[in-house]
Structures are given as structure tokens and as C-alpha cells.
Amino acid sequence: MIKGTGHMIVNIANDRGMSIDSIRKTIKESVLIAYKKYFGSNENAFIKFDDDTGDLSVYAKKKIVKEVKDSLLEILEKDISKENIVEGDYAYIEINPKVFDRLSIQVAKQRTKNDLQGIEDNEILSEFKSKLNKVVIGYVQQNRNGDLYVNLGNTDGIIPKKYQSPREVYNLNDKIRVLVYNVKKGKNGIEVILSRTHPKFIEELLALEIPEIEEGIIKIHKIVRDPGYRIKVAVYSEKEEIDPVGPCIGQKGVRIQSIIKELEGEKIDIIPYSKDIKEFIKDSLTPSKIEHVYILDEDLHKALVVVSDDQLSLAIGKMGQNVRLANRLLDWAIDVKTSSQFAEMKANSEFKQETLEMFDKVMQDVVEEEQFEEISKISDLKLLDPSVISNLSKEGFDDINNFLQADEGVLFNLGVSYEKQEEINKILKEGMIIIANDNDESMEKVEEDEELLCPECGVVINENMTSCPGCKIGLSFEFEEE
């Protein structure tokens, strides 16, 4: 018996978080390797762990014979000692592991080390896979090139710099809550990737602090976050009588403040989710107060929000943060305007309608293709960059009629500045046209010649034509002699 092995196995199990059975199995396999290395075979080897102490014993199973031909497998009855175990025709002779040579022991030790590491890795992998997307508690061990290494008990995890909030700073041995983001086998063992920026981390914190979320009474529609600065959480309840926001805030804000404290003061907006998109848009832009919401394109998820002048900065947020988070929460593109800006847009809209009518009238008068080139596309004006023209074409706004009827904010989002819109509108308002052949003599000739019209469509024609440039009907001319 190898005394102390039972105690050693228990210590390894406690230190590494491994099961005693898995450690015993590994040690048994390693001893069998040493046995075979020394004796040449381990077919008759028998390994036993004491029921009381857990200590290891190694036996050689030998057949009791009157004449020994193979000392490894056979034994004389007279050579069996009282300590040996006899079962029928076989005796179990205890082997002192000290008989193994150094090489056999070294091979067994290396095998044990590798196997124990493999078992430990598999158990850690299994444990943390079951904790994926869950919050665990650890202690900061070190900061290496911006990455935080966290002691999780039986292993270490790492919070890459990109998964850390810029607001948070940690010192050695600080207690920290983290989300188990990913677990995988790496070159140096199991890698446990942690995060404090993932939306799931916020969801887990909310569930820990708010029983109604944990119990499913209140549900989370979506979470968006600009780590270190602001979080927006849309919540709802399937029971109409339940206010989804109040329980999340808590009495005197105690629940939400607990989470804000955990995030080192990061702002959190709890927003009631609504299927009424206008209401949802209004609430998503909290803390600002919204006057009106206009749906510009329901299919493309585009909307215009109007706020008072003093609410614009709140609605947009610092560096556009508030409206950007709202866009992500809604999956809509929101354009925010002040009341005064919106009034100006309305005036411009009426102006565009007048311009459109005037433009149509002018173009109706321009019918002679030999003299004039009709402008039907904004791209013909050569006033916008190709990329902007491409954007307009995709939305159908390269067509002048569509352009004039388009909302000013929509055009702005496609890359046409308000100044450029004004310039284009002015050109069209003044009825400018491009003269293809502005030769004075040809113009005078048109005025002097008798005007001929196509009998089918009314387009101006002349005797040199064989077909109408308008309707393409075939032409022939007969002139009476004077």
C-alpha cells in the first residue's frame, strides 16, 4: 500500500475542483503504465484503493501452481505470505512500487500530470459552458497590456480591453462582476473570455436586481448601449395592468441606482416598449420632450421628430449619442428638427409644389427637340457629386418631379445639403433650360418659317422629316402650288 495517496487525491480534488473518481482513474492508468514498463506486461496487474483511507495498493495476480514456469504469472503455494490475498486458484501478490525503475516512474508521473491537466481542462470547459451568458464574480489579478485577468476560483478569466467600460478602473484584488462571454480550448489550456460591455451583461444585472424580470412578469424587448456613457432598455409586460417601467426603477430609484452604481455611474434609460411606433419613438428619445412625430417612410423605417428649440440638444445628445442609441433601439432612422426648422421646411415644401407646377408649364412649351434639350433628371444639372446622385437614383429622386416633391429632410439624409437644395430649387423656379443649338440664325428661321404640327400628337415638325419626333408616326408632305 502506498500510504498517503488517499489524502493526496482528496487535496488535488479540492484544489483543482476535480472529482475523486476521475483522479483515481488517472492514477490507476499511470501505475499500469509503470507496471508494464517494468514487467513487460500489465495483464495480471490489479489496482485497488482502500475503502477507508483511499490509499493505493498494487497487486500481481498469479496462478497457484506446483511448478513455476513463468514467475510473472505463476507462484508456488509455499511462497504465498499471509498478507497476500487468495481467491480460488489465484493469489494476489502485493507489489512494492519501489521496485519500479526510475524511468517507469517518470513515465507514469508525466502521464498522470498530462491526464490530470486534461481532466481539469474538460471539467472547467464543461463548468463554464454551463455559465455562458451568465454573470459570475471574480477578483482582479493583474492588468496586462490593458487586458484584465480575473481569478474565478478554479481558473482565471480574461476581460479584453475592448470588453471593458472606459468609465471603469480596477485595482489588484478588486471584486468584480463579469459576464462569461466565451469559453474555448487554447494553446495554454482553457480560455474563459469575460465581458462588462455586452448587452447580455446588462440583462443579467437587471434580472439579478429586479425580481419581476427574473420571474418573467416584465420582459426585455431590446437593450442598446454606448459602454461607459448611456444604456437604453425597452421593457414591456404581457399583462396590460402592469407598469413595466416602475418596478425597474424601484421605490425612490433604489433598484436602478444599484445597477448604475455597479456600472460606475453610467446612465440608464428605462423605456416602455410600444407597438405604436410613434409612441415608441417619443419614449426612445428620453430625456427630451417630443412635440410631434412624422412617419416619412414606413417601409424604409424613416421618421422625423420635432422638438422645441430648447430640447434639441437633449434629443440629439452629446455627439449625437442619444438619437444614435434611439435609432439602434428602434431600428429606424430618426431625423430631429426644431419647431422653427420644421416651419421653414413646411414653407419650402409649399414652394416646391409651386415650382413643380411652373416647371411642368415651362416644359410643356419646350417641344422642338432640334432646338432644345429637355431636362428630366437632377443629374443633368451637374450640381451634385456622383455618390449623391447614386443615392438619389436608388430612392428614385434623380427624377425632377420626385425630387421636387421629396421632403427636405429625406434629401438631406441622402447627401443633398439644404444650401444645395435651395440652389437647385432656384434654378428650377426660374425655369432655366439648356439650349442644345443656340444658333441665332436657326432661331430666326424657326420664327420666319410657317409652323407645322403633327396631326397625331401636335409636336412641331418640318417638311424635311420622314417621321414625327414625338409619336414616331410616318410623315409625308404635299404642298399646293401658289
Curated annotation (Swiss-Prot):
Cellular component (GO) terms are: cytosol
User: Known Pfam families for this protein?
Assistant: KH_5, NusA_N, S1
Major subcellular location class:
cytoplasm
Signal among the record's keywords?
Answer: no
UniProt key word Transferase: no
InterPro entries tied to this protein: KH_dom, KH_dom-like_a/b, KH_dom_NusA-like, KH_sf_prok-type, NA-bd_OB-fold, NusA_bac, NusA_N_sf, S1_domain
Q: Which UniProt keywords apply?
A: Cytoplasm, RNA-binding, Transcription, Transcription antitermination, Transcription regulation, Transcription termination
Q: Which residues form the KH domain?
A: 300-446
- Enumerate the subcellular locations listed in this protein's record, separating them with semicolons: Cytoplasm
One GO term in the molecular function aspect is: DNA-binding transcription factor activity
Q: Which BP terms does GO give this entry?
A: DNA-templated transcription termination; transcription antitermination
Q: Residue ranges of the S1 motif domain?
A: 133-197
* Database matches in Gene3D superfamilies: 3.30.300.20, Nucleic acid-binding proteins (2.40.50.140), NusA, N-terminal domain (3.30.1480.10)
**Quaternary structure annotation from Swiss-Prot or TrEMBL:** Monomer. Binds directly to the core enzyme of the DNA-dependent RNA polymerase and to nascent RNA.
What protein family is recorded? Belongs to the NusA family.
What's this protein's function?
Participates in both transcription termination and antitermination.
Concerning PANTHER family, the annotation shows: TRANSCRIPTION TERMINATION FACTOR NUSA, TRANSCRIPTION TERMINATION_ANTITERMINATION PROTEIN NUSA
Q: What protein name does the entry list?
A: Transcription termination/antitermination protein NusA
- Source species of the chain: Borreliella burgdorferi (strain ATCC 35210 / DSM 4680 / CIP 102532 / B31)
